[in-house]
């Protein structure tokens, strides 16, 4: 993996539970002594795992990186639910289970297109106000239209265990961006005729980035190396340019390439990211210039 100092790139963090994604951004700003830090793909406060951060010019890549699928491991308790749909909330309903629910029978119904209504405790905004703000104030939470998502993989990773008329098990999920794992667990329980909440959510992947390359937040400091801009876009097709084409790329002028890629990262002969171009009609136009 290429690294660079001073920092212009991507940092993959293993977010701990108990803090927000924005808290992570502030911690990294202080630790790396830089103001320009952003994140792609918000993680719940009570969730942990992969959080992709852009450092300085790396913030320009976040919109591209946030389009990718996300992968999770999560634990669910069936038979009891909370107002937040996770273990940190207040219990609002209990439906003791008399037998082990047939979870595997309903999992296939979630694969493919899946319409999900965001939970009341979410950062979705209505009239400039987040849904969780309405909920915390005890006000009626506005109705939000369901969103169409895609679930690529959903399966159980542990046996179902029964204790005190509740069922416990863990799952693997790979889905499109924007999914609320807490709500998925609740929807899964509804198909089984019961209620549920998540007891743990751990994001193990975001696009090409995995938990194995994530750094613990408390290990970040001013000397921490970051992933280069080009390496961060590891799946994006590229063209290496020089001479007149390099001049045009640095100045955001149209470029002409054969091929069908809708997006291209433009590199100089040293492999440094110069720009990102998008196909438009018969040529490619600059979307972001980094040179």
Give residue ranges: language-model regions.
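The conserved catalytic core of RNA pseudouridine synthases
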Residues: 30-34, 52, 142-193
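Acidic, low-complexity central loop/insert segments
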Residues: 64-118
